[in-house]
């Protein structure tokens, strides 16, 4: 081997070491770790696509099509959010909707797998009635309201849509109703009374059973 080849080999090794010291190619491992962490974070949530619509816009050169997706994301333990994504492709629209839903997370007050009290949610022309149910009842809901309740982790509930059957209106009405729920402790503090004076006996028993489990 000639002296020039040896020097060329040493130069290549030095260049590789310089790149590694500067964090050039070895950064790929860090990027992969970040991607894996983001993927694990997404996998721990429940995602439901309620509806996908195609939207067309008339321009000078013709029509431009895009897609909108209504997505619900929850952890199944009381956290849920709704997002609306728009993109030129369906997967991108779903991804944007899921990201927006995670930004809109809110906590649903529950006792022993059901909501704390009856409530009625309204949004635009959508009206949804929600009532607590006994253990073992299941999620008695149809249409677009069921995915919201399932992603939130509600196990027993009675739900009925009283207004527009439009999926977007039903979802937002369901979310509006869930956001109006309050815990019995909050009601007791607001009225200046004890929890036993405010909450029904059946709710207190269910609450005690849930804490014991």
Swiss-Prot record:
Residues 45-108 form the S5 DRBM domain. Residues 1-42 are annotated as: Disordered. It comes from Corynebacterium urealyticum (strain ATCC 43042 / DSM 7109). One of its GO terms (biological process) is translation. Belongs to the universal ribosomal protein uS5 family. The keyword Hydrolase does not apply. Gene3D superfamilies: 3.30.160.20, 3.30.230.10. Keywords: Ribonucleoprotein, Ribosomal protein, RNA-binding, rRNA-binding. Part of the 30S ribosomal subunit. Contacts proteins S4 and S8. GO terms for cellular component: small ribosomal subunit. This is Small ribosomal subunit protein uS5. InterPro entries: Ribosomal_Su5_D2-typ_SF, Ribosomal_uS5, Ribosomal_uS5_bac-type, Ribosomal_uS5_C, Ribosomal_uS5_N, Ribosomal_uS5_N_CS, Ribsml_uS5_D2-typ_fold_subgr. The keyword Ribosomal protein applies. GO terms for molecular function: rRNA binding; structural constituent of ribosome. With S4 and S12 plays an important role in translational accuracy. Located at the back of the 30S subunit body where it stabilizes the conformation of the head with respect to the body. The N-terminal domain interacts with the head of the 30S subunit; the C-terminal domain interacts with the body and contacts protein S4. The interaction surface between S4 and S5 is involved in control of translational fidelity. The lineage of its organism: Bacteria, Bacillati, Actinomycetota, Actinomycetes, Mycobacteriales.
């Amino acid at each position: 081997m000639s002296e020039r080849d040896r020097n060329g080999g040493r130069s290549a090794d030095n260049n590789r070491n310089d790149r590694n010291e500067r964090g050039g190619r070895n950064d790929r491992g860090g990027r992969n770790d970040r991607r894996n962490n983001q993927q694990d974070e997404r996998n721990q949530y429940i995602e439901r696509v309620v509806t996908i619509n195609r939207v067309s816009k008339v321009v000078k050169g013709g029509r431009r099509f895009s897609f909108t997706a209504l997505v619900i994301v929850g952890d199944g333990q009381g956290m849920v959010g709704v997002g609306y994504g728009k993109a030129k492709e369906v997967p991108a629209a779903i991804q944007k909707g899921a990201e927006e839903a995670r930004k809109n997370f809110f906590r649903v007050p529950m006792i022993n797998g059901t909501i704390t009290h009856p409530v009625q949610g309204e949004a635009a022309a959508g009206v949804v009635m929600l009532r607590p149910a006994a253990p073992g009842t299941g999620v008695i809901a149809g249409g677009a309201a069921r995915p919201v309740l399932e992603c939130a982790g509600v196990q027993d509930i009675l739900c009925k849509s009283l207004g527009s059957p439009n999926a977007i209106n039903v979802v937002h009405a369901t979310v509006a109703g869930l956001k109006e729920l309050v815990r019995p402790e909050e009601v007791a503090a607001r009225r200046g009374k004890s929890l036993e004076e405010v909450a029904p006996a059946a709710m207190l028993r269910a609450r005690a059973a849930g804490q014991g489990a």
